[in-house]
């Protein structure tokens, strides 16, 4: 790579097996969860414990929730509140319907670029 980065490039990890979470706690620069919800909050708390056990400051370790847009506004607010209460530092809103097939969540129903932009505006309005 030229020019060489002035700082190391952050490496975020994400898989919720105990071994993978321990590895993230030991060497990761951040962690991303593929979903959002109560079990994710519990896993985030467990990850913070592991980070502390590794002698690292868990309060500065970024953690991301991934929220499927297809869940709809009736769930967005609650899940966003759970993320805030759990001190989740990042929130990804997944508007791609293709991922709903493997995640088991409702598709977003968004097709065009304008649909996606309007969808993100609806999300922001619903959670702020």
Residue ranges of each PLM-predicted region?
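Active-site-adjacent structural elements that line small-molecule/cofactor binding pockets in enzymes
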Residues: 1-128
